[in-house]
């Protein structure tokens, strides 16, 4: 028989793995290098019936330690935060919402998949909140009844009984019994104490009788315990098979699934049981049990056997369940088996049931793992995008944003264009905001060639970079100190779209020139853009440039005259004059002739503002520059020299009274 053949191979493998001395070679389990992505395509060869098993070094860790929600899958964040986040998210959703569709959409958008383990953790946290617990339990019961195990039922009984909901407690007991689940001692003790405290003697007696009968019956939980004890205790053989048969139990899907999952710590024995029960005609495997076996074998050491089970399951017309995908792909990514994770993604996406297809969040997490791998394999990226979009799914800005963030985290921003090209083949066109983000990240990192390639790529796609994206290029080059390239991009932007939205990027350009001590070049740039392209700089741009032109060294070399020439341009653009830097200049080094030039620049209808005149004189005299103030007064026209306010200022701020800031001025 075929069963006898694979059993002998399994046992032979087991004996070899328990020899006292092993060669280094015998301790290494070979991992098939073949891809099983072809399983989803027609023309697949006949299913291999024999299982090639290799020696095992140690039992596998319990699957209970694996992540149960999509939000945890592939994540590079700390595990503790993710686990608590999934439970908190579920509790928040069921505390706020009541509609089935609302809840389903919220769970999907949060990237949470309800599994048996996650359901149990949520119920434990809701022990003192029976209303939300009932809502949550009822929703799972209707939406995913297969995710309710004996432990889940017992936890719900504990909540109902512990909160005095006696009728609902007994109602759930009846439902639970029909499903073959038994009452746990923990529930008996907890609820029994509550019944006794509330004086519910008849209910207490009924509870005790129920537990006694459960200990003697063939509930799924009890049968599972007995089968697992037999299988785990001894080496597999005729005696083990006979003892399991002698239990005289009817094996149903939930029971077989439970046993296989319980044997997770011994994957080899789980597979022996799985094969034997089918070959012995005790049970015909279905989608539920195949997936349970796949979850147990979905580990690096059992890769070949996992692949065989998946092929067999698909050939039988069954699909990879979402929980299987999440658990196994998580393990694959944790052990750097990125190619195998993509293979599994292709198979899971090929399923006809949308509820079993990996979610957009799953897809995003897989792409993030691909781009942060030791070597970025664009073929894997392309395969994942292709199979995802083939199912009618759309690629989004939020997806690309998340993937690019991961790409930057491993300092591969220069490969952004490669990702973008692959996504374009999937029908994706980046929005203006995404264009800006990509342009900024490339130029800030000084990746000129890649930035040029990005611009060319967008133009060849018939989608020229919009003004915001071009501005981001300019800003990025400014931040990286590449002023020449920043200027080229700015002029290209103005040539393509005009100056309507160029004011912010122009300010960045001016500031970058100033920071590079090229202030006068910034002035020339502003003058040229205003004259040639009718650019209207921001008021803040004028302020920054004027302030920098009036620094001591630059002002002496012609900066003062240039700053002065900006005042009428500011006025033409509707901005008030910015005179504070001029006052600072006159208080220290400004000459009387320069002050007169400033007053002329501030003249309106042939008369300067008297308030400005008074401020200039006062600034000079407060700084003990009385001689410069007198020289300026002598250069002013009569209407200023004879102005009462001016005369009063000079009378009250005589040298011996006004030299408060510079005592040495008293000797001037």
From Swiss-Prot:
Start and end residues of the PPR repeats are: 286-320, 321-355, 396-430, 431-465, 466-496, 502-537, 543-577
Q: Which family does it belong to?
A: Belongs to the PPR family. P subfamily.
Q: Which GO terms describe its molecular function?
A: mRNA binding
**Subunit and interaction comment:** Component of the mitochondrial ribosome small subunit.
Q: Give the source species.
A: Arabidopsis thaliana (Mouse-ear cress)
BP GO annotations: RNA splicing
Q: Pull one GO CC term from this UniProt entry.
A: ribosome
The family database entries (Gene3D superfamilies) matched by this protein are listed as: Tetratricopeptide repeat domain
Q: What is this protein called?
A: Small ribosomal subunit protein mS81 (rPPR8)
Matching entries from Pfam families are given as: PPR
């Amino acid at each position: 028989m075929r069963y006898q053949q694979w059993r002998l191979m399994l046992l032979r493998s087991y004996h070899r793995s328990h020899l006292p001395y092993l060669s280094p070679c015998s301790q290494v389990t070979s991992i098939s290098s073949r891809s099983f992505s072809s399983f989803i395509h027609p023309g697949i060869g006949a299913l291999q019936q024999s299982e090639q098993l290799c020696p095992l070094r140690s039992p596998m860790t319990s699957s209970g330690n694996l992540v149960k929600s999509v939000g945890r899958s592939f994540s590079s964040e700390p595990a503790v935060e993710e686990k608590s986040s999934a439970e908190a998210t579920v509790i928040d959703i069921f505390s706020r919402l009541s509609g089935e569709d609302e809840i389903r959409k919220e769970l999907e958008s949060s990237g949470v998949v309800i599994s048996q383990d996650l359901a149990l953790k949520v119920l434990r946290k809701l022990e003192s909140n029976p209303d939300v617990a009932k809502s949550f339990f009822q929703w799972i019961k209707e939406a995913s009844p297969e995710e309710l195990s004996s432990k889940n039922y017992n936890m719900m009984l504990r909540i109902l009984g512990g909160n005095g909901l006696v009728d609902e407690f007994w109602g759930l007991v009846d439902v639970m019994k029909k499903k073959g689940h038994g009452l746990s001692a923990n529930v008996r003790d907890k609820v029994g104490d509550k019944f006794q405290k509330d004086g519910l003697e008849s209910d207490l007696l009924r509870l005790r009788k129920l537990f006694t009968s459960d200990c003697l019956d063939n509930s799924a939980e009890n049968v599972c315990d007995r089968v697992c004890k037999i299988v785990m205790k001894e080496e597999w053989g005729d005696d083990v098979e006979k003892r399991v048969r002698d239990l005289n139990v009817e094996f149903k899907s939930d029971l077989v699934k439970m046993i296989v999952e319980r044997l997770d710590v011994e994957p080899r024995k789980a597979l022996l049981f799985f094969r034997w029960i089918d070959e012995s005609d005790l049970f015909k495997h279905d989608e539920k049990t195949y997936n349970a076996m796949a979850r147990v074998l979905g580990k690096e050491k059992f890769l070949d056997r996992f692949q065989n089970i998946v092929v067999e399951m698909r050939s039988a017309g069954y699909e990879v369940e979402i929980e299987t995908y999440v658990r196994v792909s998580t393990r694959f990514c944790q052990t750097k088996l990125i190619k195998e994770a993509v293979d599994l993604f292709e198979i899971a996406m090929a399923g006809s049931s949308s509820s079993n297809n990996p979610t957009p969040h799953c897809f995003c997490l897989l792409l993030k793992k691909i781009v942060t791998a030791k070597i970025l394999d664009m073929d894997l990226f392309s395969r994942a995008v292709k199979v995802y979009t083939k199912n009618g799914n759309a690629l989004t800005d939020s997806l690309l944003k998340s993937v690019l963030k991961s790409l930057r985290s491993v300092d591969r921003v220069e490969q952004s264009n490669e990702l973008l090209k692959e996504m374009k083949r999937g029908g994706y066109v980046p929005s203006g905001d995404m264009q800006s983000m990509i342009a900024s990240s490339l130029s800030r990192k000084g990746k000129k060639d890649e930035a040029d390639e990005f611009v060319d790529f967008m133009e060849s796609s018939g989608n020229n970079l919009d003004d915001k994206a071009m501005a981001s290029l300019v800003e990025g080059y400014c931040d990286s100190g590449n002023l020449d390239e920043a200027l080229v991009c700015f002029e290209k932007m103005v040539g393509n779209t005009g100056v309507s939205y160029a004011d912010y990027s122009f300010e960045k350009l001016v500031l970058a020139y100033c920071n590079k001590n090229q202030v006068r070049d910034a002035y020339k740039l502003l003058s040229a853009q205003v004259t040639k392209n009718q650019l209207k700089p921001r008021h803040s741009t004028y302020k920054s440039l004027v302030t920098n032109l009036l620094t001591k060294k630059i002002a002496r070399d012609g900066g003062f005259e240039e700053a002065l020439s900006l005042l009428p341009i500011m006025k033409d653009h509707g901005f008030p004059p910015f005179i504070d830097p001029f006052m600072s200049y006159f208080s220290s080094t400004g000459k009387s002739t320069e002050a007169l030039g400033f007053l002329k620049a501030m003249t309106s209808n042939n008369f300067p503002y008297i308030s400005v005149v008074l401020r200039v004189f006062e600034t000079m005299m407060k700084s003990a520059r009385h001689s410069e103030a007198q020289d300026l007064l002598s250069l002013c026209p009569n209407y200023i020299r004879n102005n009462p306010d001016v005369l009063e200022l000079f009378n009250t701020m005589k040298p011996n009274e006004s030299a408060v800031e510079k005592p040495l001025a008293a000797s001037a």
